[in-house]
């Protein structure tokens, strides 16, 4: 959000022609204030543009919200996939899980507001919008299903619950971590240890 506010005619022209900047600002506002408390005027003001100019890029708040929501999943999915791609093909299950959990946490608590905005406001959205975001969510859940399947070999029926639990536990760190004092690597150490040894047990070895 460091490039959020611009001033003068040149800055306003840049804001009007940069949808990505608008999305950055919207994601930051949704993350900090929630869905209902954010208006198109709020976003336009922070972007240094007039509200009608904002509607040129995003015809409604619905369009803006859904763009932020979809990007929130894409950001974390790409982060996890990139981290996994860096591992050797024969990496152990526990190594792949540890890598994926760390990548998820870095995306969630890192510089981008998109993933944390998605997590925070998903439950605040109308049901139709939640359904619209589900294809992206299912694509991401499929990655975790593949990662966690070896830990459920003895009872495959528990796999969906285990996927939901792990993703939910990672996302829940938004609720109890102080963003002003966060050390992402220390957090990753703590959370991955708990999930690997307390939840996944010997099946993750």
What do the PLM-derived regions correspond to, one by one?
Residues 105-145, 175-177:
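Short secondary-structure transition hinges
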Residues 55-58, 119-125, 168:
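Short helix-capping/turn signature of helix-turn-helix
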């Amino acid at each position: 959000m460091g490039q959020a506010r611009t001033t003068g005619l040149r800055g306003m022209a840049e804001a009007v022609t940069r949808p990505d900047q608008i999305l950055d600002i919207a994601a930051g506002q949704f993350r900090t204030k929630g869905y209902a408390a954010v208006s198109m005027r709020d976003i336009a003001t922070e972007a240094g543009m007039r509200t009608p100019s904002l509607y040129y890029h995003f015809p409604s708040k619905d369009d803006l919200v859904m763009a932020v929501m979809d990007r929130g999943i894409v950001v974390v999915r790409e982060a996890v996939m990139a981290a996994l791609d860096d591992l050797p093909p024969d990496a152990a299950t526990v190594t792949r899980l540890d890598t994926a959990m760390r990548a998820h946490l870095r995306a969630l608590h890192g510089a981008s507001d998109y993933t944390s905005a998605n997590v925070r406001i998903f439950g605040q959205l109308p049901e139709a919008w939640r359904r619209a975001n589900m294809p992206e969510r299912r694509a991401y859940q499929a990655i975790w299903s593949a990662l966690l399947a070896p830990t459920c070999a003895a009872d495959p029926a528990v796999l969906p619950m285990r996927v939901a639990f792990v993703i939910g536990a990672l996302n829940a760190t938004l609720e109890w971590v102080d963003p002003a004092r966060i050390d992402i690597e220390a957090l990753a150490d703590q959370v991955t240890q708990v999930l690997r040894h307390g939840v996944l047990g010997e099946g993750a070895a």
